[in-house]
């Protein structure tokens, strides 16, 4: 029944919001990497020398990032002119993510090693999350899901001999 479902959703939302009362902002800061989004470009190469050459060519505007990615990148981003995203900051390789966290839009990074690749990245745009009602709901639902799983595991362990 629709009325029962709406009542259930309302109660669930109220419980979720009450769970984050008082700790919402610290929870927000803890999960900020999952809430913020970035749009960036990447070129992956197996040759360090070629990576350096392409980096300097992009930096001096001899070639655009998109042209370089299309022509030289050895990953799937060669089909998108290097574009990746928008993605949260937990999605990219940690070496890439750490640079994107502190980058300014249009900032080009010198080649660095990420796994087997020599990687060139440039942040295009950062979509900053805000601590608003939508974010509070997301965090509350996350916490409620975690608490529900914890309670479920506790009950299973307590009554496993009876199941």
Feature map (PLM): residue ranges:
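Peptidyl-prolyl cis-trans isomerase
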Residues: 1-163
